[in-house]
Structures are given as structure tokens and as C-alpha cells.
């Protein structure tokens, strides 16, 4: 590869990005805000490794993630290694194999980057930034409600624009399918129609199947079972099988607890949601921001996952896609997370010791500070530095001028006053 003739984009693999300060500071801000909320709810941070043995990792992956796992040979062990496409299976492995003495439930949080193979023409990101939580050891609806309430609080703390959490329950669909004699192809066809909420195609498919009118009515109702809380009452009048009835009872209890959290105003229900059928075991949910087509967070209950690592324990969790948050909240983050420094201290080289001393003091006051030596920078140069305040030390080494590039206001002060922290910056 002759890098001399390559554009900056062509120098890195497709599906990954360089993040320059203007966006890197926003990603860091999102991470900090999320982990502040995670910590407030009592979740402890863990850091999984960047690599896993493929045969170990695959035990905890759903079918959709098997095909997008990046793998390669390990020259040391001769085993196949993999870059994890999701962090939750790693958390399950760590809990099951490393945390035998830990009390239950365990509340764990994480931030990391995962890699997923995508088709070249799809144009999707192969590298995904995740921040999430897992609660392991609580089988009750209160744990599911805690996940949803915390996800809502995270979005609120980020000052996200209009947002909703869409809640599903995979056991409801499994109950509808239970007792039907369908081959794998028929199941896939039905699920595709449900995925696209294509009622007419679903009805046409029903006419080809040998099922009762009651079973057909249950299936045909699925695309319409989305909306507010009234969906539960509607569904209760449609389904007759016990498995689906239990799923509805579970959802009633989750929503009752969300009301206690005062977190029920921004939720919707979708009982035709089939995401992660081979992975999730109960309540599932997705977070959406108005005007952005992809989910910014995904979560749900996965009671069978830790058993794949030798320790069956009920669990639930969710993860935010940080890049989806970045792209969907760009305007809001522009104000909340700006690159640059708080203060630029400028002086002649004759007064470098004063500039260094002043910068040191200001950093102790939790300011970000850069020093510069030479003539006072002009407006164009200040914009390049992205500084909030310019402190220009005069030639006498004592008087200073404070200038705000944003407000264009100028103030006079002294080095002594700044060193004594008596000037509001």
C-alpha cells in the first residue's frame, strides 16, 4: 500500500473512524454522564478484555452476532481468538467464573468498544462504542423496571430531545407460536412479516397454514399490538394461551413499578417485537430519539446466558450505542461538550516563569490551561485554540488583560490577584 497517494479516509479500514477533538470530547462527555447515572444507581465498573477465545465467547452470542464476529489465529496458543461483538457475554463469563463469592444481585457497569463484521456495501460502522449495565441475580419484574427506569434517567440526564422506550416481551410471542406445527421456513416467513408489521402478507400466510381460527387470530393481532398501556388490555382479550397470559402479567407488574418510579410517561409497548428471540428470555426494550431511525439503547432479560458459562443465574441489562447518541444529539452536545481549553495564558518569553506559575495555580483550581509565548494572539488564532478565556500578561509581568472570545468582553487584573484566586474566571 502506497500511503503517499491515499486520502485520510483510505488510510484506515472501512467501517472505523478517527474521532478528532470536536467529536471525541462529545463521546467522552456522553460516557461521563452515563457512568455518573450508573454509579448513582449503585453499579460497579468492570473492564473486560479486548480479546476472547472464540469457542468461549460464542457460548454467549445470539445467532445474529455469530456471523459478525471478527476472528483470527493466535500464534501463541494456536487457538482462534475473537474481538467481542458485544460486551454482555463477557460480563456473563466474568460473573460466572470469577465472582463466586459476590453477593446477589450483582450490579455491574462497563464502557468499551466492540467490533462487528459488516457487509462492505452496507456502509455501517464496524466499531461500536458501548456503555451499559447488567443486573445479575434478580429474577423479579423489579429488576426489569430498574433497567428501563435507569435508561430513561440516562437520556434525561443527557438532555436528550423527545425520546421513548419501546417495551416488548418475547415470551408473549413464544406463547402464540406454542402448539403450532410450523416448519423453520414457515416460522421465518411469519417473523419477517411481523418484523415489517405487514398484516396483509401475514394474513395471506395464515391461509396456507393448518391452524385453528383462534391461533390465526392471535398471530394476526401481533402487528397491531403496539402503542400505550391499552395494548395490554387489547392483548389480554386476544390471546388464550397461558404462556402469553403470563407474559402480560409480567408486563403489568413492570409498568406498575415504573409508575412508582414516575418513569412511565415515555414508554410504549410493542408485543410484536421479535428482536433477539434466541437470546432474550422475557422483557426487552429499545430507546429511540425523535427523528433518528436507529435505537440508541437496547436491553432486556437473558436468564439463560450465564448458564453457558456454568452458573445459571437470572439477569437483565442494557447498553447504549454511544455513536448513535453522538449523531442523534449533535446539536445539543455542541453546547454541552466543546473542545479546547478553559484558559490560554499568553506572555513574552521574558515572563515565562510567571506564565508557568500562573498556569500551575489555575490547574489546581480545576481549570484546563495552556501556555503560549509571543505577541497577543488575534481572534483567528484564538478560535483555533478553542479557549474560553485569554489571559495576556503585560510586559511589566504583573498587569494582565482577560479577554472572552465568546462575549468579546475585556477585563483588567493582576497576576497577584489571579494567584490568590480572588478573580472569578
Model-based region annotation:
Residues 1-11, 177, 182-189:
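Charged, compositionally biased N-terminal leader segments and the immediate start
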Residues 1-89, 145, 166:
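TRNA-binding/sensing appendages of the translation machinery
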Residues 2, 29-41, 52-53, 88-101, ...:
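Positively charged, Gly/Ser-enriched RNA/tRNA-binding surfaces
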Residues 51, 168, 190, 375:
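Residue-level "edge-of-site" marker
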Residues 60-64, 179-180, 283, 383-387:
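Short low-complexity, flexible loop/linker segments enriched in glycine and/or proline
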Residues 67-76, 182-204, 289:
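Acidic, His- and aromatic-enriched active-site or binding-groove loops in soluble protein domains
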Residues 125-131, 167-175:
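Short, conserved phosphate-binding/catalytic loop or strand-edge motifs used
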Residues 158-162, 170-173, 186:
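Extended alpha-helical scaffolds
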Amino acid at each position: 500500500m502506497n500511503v503517499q497517494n491515499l486520502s485520510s479516509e483510505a488510510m484506515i479500514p472501512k467501517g472505523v473512524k478517527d474521532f478528532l477533538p470536536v467529536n471525541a470530547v462529545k463521546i467522552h462527555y456522553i460516557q461521563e454522564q452515563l457512568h455518573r447515572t450508573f454509579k448513582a444507581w449503585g453499579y460497579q465498573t468492570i473492564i473486560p478484555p479486548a480479546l476472547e477465545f472464540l469457542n468461549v465467547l460464542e457460548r454467549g452470542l445470539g445467532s445474529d452476532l455469530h456471523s459478525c464476529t471478527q476472528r483470527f489465529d493466535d500464534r501463541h496458543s494456536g487457538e482462534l481468538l475473537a474481538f467481542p461483538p458485544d460486551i454482555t457475554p463477557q460480563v456473563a463469563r466474568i460473573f460466572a467464573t470469577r465472582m463466586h463469592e459476590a453477593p446477589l444481585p450483582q450490579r455491574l457497569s462497563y464502557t468499551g468498544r466492540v467490533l462487528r463484521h459488516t457487509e462492505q456495501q452496507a456502509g455501517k460502522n464496524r466499531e461500536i462504542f458501548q456503555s451499559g449495565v447488567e443486573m445479575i441475580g434478580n429474577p423479579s419484574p423489579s429488576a426489569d423496571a430498574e433497567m428501563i427506569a435507569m435508561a430513561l434517567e440516562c437520556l434525561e440526564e443527557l438532555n436528550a430531545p423527545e425520546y421513548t422506550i419501546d417495551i416488548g416481551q418475547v415470551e408473549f410471542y413464544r406463547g402464540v407460536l406454542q402448539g403450532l406445527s410450523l416448519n423453520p421456513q414457515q416460522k421465518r416467513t411469519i417473523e419477517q412479516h411481523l418484523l415489517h408489521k405487514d398484516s396483509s402478507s401475514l394474513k395471506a400466510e395464515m391461509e396456507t397454514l393448518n391452524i385453528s381460527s383462534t391461533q390465526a387470530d392471535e398471530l394476526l393481532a401481533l402487528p397491531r399490538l403496539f402503542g400505550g398501556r391499552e395494548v395490554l388490555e387489547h392483548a389480554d382479550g386476544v390471546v388464550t394461551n397461558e404462556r402469553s397470559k403470563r407474559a402480560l402479567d409480567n408486563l403489568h407488574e413492570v409498568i406498575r413499578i415504573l409508575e412508582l418510579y414516575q418513569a412511565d410517561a415515555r414508554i410504549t409497548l410493542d408485543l410484536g417485537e421479535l428482536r433477539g428471540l434466541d437470546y432474550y428470555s422475557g422483557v426487552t426494550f429499545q430507546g429511540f430519539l425523535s427523528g433518528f431511525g436507529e435505537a440508541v439503547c437496547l436491553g432486556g432479560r437473558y436468564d439463560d446466558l450465564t448458564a453457558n458459562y456454568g452458573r445459571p443465574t437470572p439477569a437483565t441489562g442494557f447498553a447504549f450505542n454511544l455513536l448513535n447518541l453522538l449523531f442523534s444529539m449533535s446539536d445539543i452536545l455542541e453546547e454541552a461538550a466543546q473542545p479546547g481549553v478553559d484558559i490560554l495564558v499568553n506572555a513574552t518569553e521574558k515572563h515565562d516563569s510567571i506564565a508557568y506559575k500562573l498556569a500551575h495555580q489555575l490547574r489546581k483550581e480545576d481549570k484546563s490551561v495552556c501556555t503560549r509565548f509571543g505577541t497577543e494572539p488575534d481572534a483567528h488564532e484564538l478560535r483555533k485554540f478553542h479557549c474560553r478565556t485569554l489571559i495576556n500578561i503585560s510586559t511589566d509581568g504583573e498587569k494582565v488583560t482577560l479577554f472572552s472570545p465568546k462575549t468579546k468582553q475585556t477585563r483588567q487584573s493582576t497576576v497577584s490577584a489571579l494567584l490568590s484566586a480572588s478573580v472569578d474566571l
